[in-house]
Amino acid sequence: MIGIGICLLAALCTSCRQELIEYGQGDLRISIEKGDAYLHDFPLFLGISKKNAPQMAVWTEDMQGNFLSTIYVTHKIATQSWTASGGNRRKEALPCWCHVRSVRYDDGLYLPTKAEPLTDGVSGATPREDFDVKITPKEGLKRFVVKIEINHSTDFNEFYPASAREGDTNYSGGKMGSGQPAVVYAATVDL
């Protein structure tokens, strides 16, 4: 019985270990640094809120704007594991990444489903602190663009209010939607 307990404890401890990312020649490191507004107040109930990190996707495109590959995407959008979404798949969360992938699902939307999630190889928990993403360019790829799309839930303002209704030009998913649109950053890589 003690042996089983020790094995279980050892398994639990090793599963919590963070893997170190090793970089080789030709690998690129993208660093995401947490700023003052990185964690956002997400309303829960009765005026209680929690600090929420943004949803994000990192991908590469060729110089003509054609999608090459997803490097990283946050777990919630990759697996549709939203908290209290009521079935809303949050198509407004990362619209640029969703559309550039050109993967259309049975319901007509361009974002992964619970039945067809993205692989663990490109998805991960939403980081709450600074973090790095590793890119290993394909053999012979010398010039390409790295894009990062970032979006906060419930980031409403006077132009994108929570009160906007479906069909309004400024509708962004309702009271638990995005509010302001996602932001996309791009950098050209020339090896």
Residue ranges and their predicted role:
Residues M1-I2, V58:
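Bacterial N-terminal signal peptides that target proteins for export
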